[in-house]
Amino acid sequence: MRRLLLSALTLLGLSLLSSVHSQSLSIENVHVDIANRDTVASTVPITFDVTWSGSWREGESWDAAWLFAKFEREPGVWADLRLVPSSGSVSGTVPATLELSVLPAGYANGIVLHRAEEGRGEVQFTARASWTYGASYYDLPRDGVPIRVLGVEIARVAGGPFEVGEAIVDSLRQPNAFRSAGGGAYTVASEEEIRVSDGPSALYYDVPEGEAYAGGDQAGPVPGSFPKGTEPFYIMKYPVTQGQYADFLSLLPARARAARDITAYATYADEGGTITCDEHGCTAHNPDRAAHFLSWADGIGWASWAGLRPMSELEYEKAAAGTPAERSRYADGDLPDRVGTSERRSIWGVVDLRGGLWERVVTVGSPQGRAFRGTPGLGFVDDLGHPYAFSNLDWPGPRAVGSGYRGGTEGLLGLSEVTDRTYGAYEATYGNAGQGFRAVIDEP
């Protein structure tokens, strides 16, 4: 069975070479206002322009940009840029809201920028914030320092209860799918602890004998601290792209870059990989193509560096299927005409949550997964490109214990239904052509 599983996870990447998404986020005119720096508070204003097309806001659903920055602390060494929490402002072509994501240490490591009113179409904004360089124990030179502002498009998943699994006869239920004791869908009503058992008012899932390594241990409870999706959160519209991953590699020290380099896989270029690296950095020749061959360690390294976090498998079902009133079995209401030929959007505007690259999630099916508390990435990694050991102790570590797979593809094995948990607790350390990564962040 394990051999078949490994083959399936590898072969599912073969139909994904056309997974290219039209991402339009542009960040330009980055300016550090050295003339107005505050040498007492060790802060300095920064401004930059942000543009993207296809923006929307309707009711409780809208898209946004997650923006974060790095500065060149010394030649070739880039560090996370920290912001004063109360310093943000924005102007633009439409009314906008700028929210800073504040970490427990008291500084912000990124910005969520979105429309303030309903509407659709391209948006252009000028964002302003104050860089607290003193928080990095850094003395800003009089002539300034190079900085990079980076970003990803994200979509808001509204708060509220939702269902996991589906009301269906056992013979048609997806493998290892969540259910209630009576066999119907289970309602996740709040962030409170969830009891796991085949009894009343509990969450359960059936796993064939001997396959707990893939489907989960059927144990619990799921703690109140485990992110469940009933509170609002933002999720990346698209998986990490090759352009975004190339930026990550380029701004890492040499040892960390080598550890997180995905281009050494023998079939990388043949399977659609376009990232190349040299002593000056890395370049993606097709930057909008989804980054594949990402292992769990690669994904959490990128998420930590970007100030984001992995998603739980409950958050995956909320983002993919929606609320009970708008629930979709396939995350877009129907199957596409042909695999890889059209973007599938969930009701929240999230693209290809099923039928594309496998989504890596934190599982409820192991003690290590259930220990996840959803702490945010701090914006930096260690010398192997991993989240620092002291910073995200709740995350499944580089060995992937506590992780799993959701989403799949109908291209080979028909594993694309949102409720399918065939590999919901499978802890794979490797990367291959069928694996990408998508991160989330709690609403500020």
Name the predicted role of every residue range.
Residues 85-152:
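Extended acidic/polar, glycine-enriched regions
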Residues 58-67:
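Short coil-to-beta strand junction motifs in C2/discoidin
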Residues 42-46:
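Structural beta-strand segments of beta-rich domains
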Residues 7-16:
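Bacterial N-terminal signal peptides
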Residues 289-290, 344-345, 373-444:
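Disulfide-stabilized, aromatic/cysteine-rich ligand-recognition loop
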